[in-house]
Amino acid sequence: MKAFRVGRSAALLSVAALALTACSSADNGGGNGGENGGGNSNASGTLTGGGASSQEAAMTAWKDGVKSVASDLTVQYSPDGSGAGREGFLDGQFSFAGSDAAMDEEELEKSKEVCGDKGAFHVPAYISPIAIAYNLEGVEGIKMDAETIAKVFSGEIKKWNDEQIQKQNEGLELPDKDITVVHRSDDSGTTENFTAYLTEAAGDAWKYDEVEVWPGEITAESAQGTKGVVGLASDTDGAITYTDASAAGDLNTVHVGVGEEYVEYSSEAAAAVVDKSEQNEDGSIKLDRATEEEGVYPVVLVSYHIYCNEYQDQKTADQVKAFAEYVVSEDGQKTAEESAGNAPISEDTRKAAQERIKKISAQG
């Protein structure tokens, strides 16, 4: 296999879709969702959300950028993990959630308790590779296929110079050093997407299925959130972890085996992969994690914002609409791309999101 630098694909990621059929009320406030979000003169006060720590860099840019269209709106976001974000949204603590995994059917049903009969919906906020990042001084561009990655993260392969790794890296001097696996300690959409890749692409080498909480049977180190795992891996010689690629920092990253090539992560092909993927009746997107397509990076997440179709009061509806319109606008997507290195959503995805967002209204 040869190294190939480019893009990505793969994963079953649900975009929940009550939004496709719900929302019959009028457009209360909000802009036209254009190049910069259109503006919303009715939006003011503080909008509170929480969720995926992978969104933290982009969220910082969005919180600042939304001021260009809603100068009196302040956005607060707690990056405590996707699971915590969805829980906080469903408990009424947050007006919106950021999540690297969509709500399941039970969560969608529960959303009616805070959102009314029309429930909640998902909008893709950005698309990002999941980097398999490691700390091994002087060793760059290690290649691994899916089976090898699964065996490393399950603890079956324990040394960096293991024969299975070495045979994929001819000419690269790998040390006789223990591998320390670092995983997320919290409920994590990044964990769910990473283990979904292992489940689909690695076959019997991964025995733990797709999970949001890392399997307790695996001996490994753990840390809270994206910053936590990157920080711990950076401080641990011989460590390997998985993280939103925008947060990988100075860690080296694995080139992932796809078909007859090894692919380094990049964002170029990400949005196109989503556009070309199959969409289920409920609005979920089925990405092919086991793809062998040339130049595709198969370890990927689509990060969502979760909103109510209807809010309990007009002020919150105006706040959410102004923020949501900015996030999916050309300016919002460009701002996130520049600050976080993610792939912007496509024009088709943006237009579909704008149609859903403009129908956000107040209950009653």
Language-model-detected regions and their locations in the chain:
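Bacterial signal peptide processing site
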Residues: S24-D27
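Periplasmic-binding protein-like
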Residues: D117-Y134, H255-I306
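Sec-exported extracytoplasmic/periplasmic mature domains
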Residues: T60-D72, L90-F94, A102, Y134-E137, ...
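Extracytoplasmic ligand-binding site segments that recognize negatively charged/polar headgroups
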Residues: P129-A133, V139-K227
